[in-house]
Amino acid sequence: MTVLERLAATVEARKGADPDSSWTAKLLAKGPEKCAEKFGEEAVEAIIEAVRGDRARLASEAADVLYHLLVMLAARDVTLAEVMAVLEAREGTSGIAEKAGRG
């Protein structure tokens, strides 16, 4: 199991936890919209670090983005496995062709 898979499992396990006991549970309790908002905030922070060129800070912000992506997905009951299946289906397909095929 990869670090990302373990993190996804932890996020999933926190879905029913007491919001006072876990940051993840607290975010999930606020609903999908708040989870999406937080993901967007973290994505913007990663973009800023990418523009600045600070590799260490970009890596840190990218980790935050991945975590908040998993929380946002969990809030809508979308699993990491579902996302990975989509990526696997796209593997080996030109990005241009894949996008055109979406219709």
UniProtKB/Swiss-Prot annotation:
It catalyses: 1-(5-phospho-beta-D-ribosyl)-ATP + H2O = 1-(5-phospho-beta-D-ribosyl)-5'-AMP + diphosphate + H(+). The keyword Nucleotide-binding applies. It is an enzyme of class 3 (hydrolase). Pathway: Amino-acid biosynthesis; L-histidine biosynthesis; L-histidine from 5-phospho-alpha-D-ribose 1-diphosphate: step 2/9. It is found in: Cytoplasm. The keyword Hydrolase applies. Its EC number is 3.6.1.31. CDD domains: NTP-PPase_HisIE_like. Pfam families: PRA-PH (PF01503). One of its GO terms (biological process) is L-histidine biosynthetic process. One of its GO terms (molecular function) is ATP binding. Its main location: cytoplasm. InterPro entries: HisE (IPR008179), PRib-ATP_PPHydrolase-like (IPR021130). It comes from the Bacteria. Keywords: Amino-acid biosynthesis, ATP-binding, Cytoplasm, Histidine biosynthesis, Hydrolase, Nucleotide-binding. GO terms for cellular component: cytoplasm. Belongs to the PRA-PH family. This is Phosphoribosyl-ATP pyrophosphatase. It comes from Cereibacter sphaeroides (strain ATCC 17029 / ATH 2.4.9) (Rhodobacter sphaeroides).
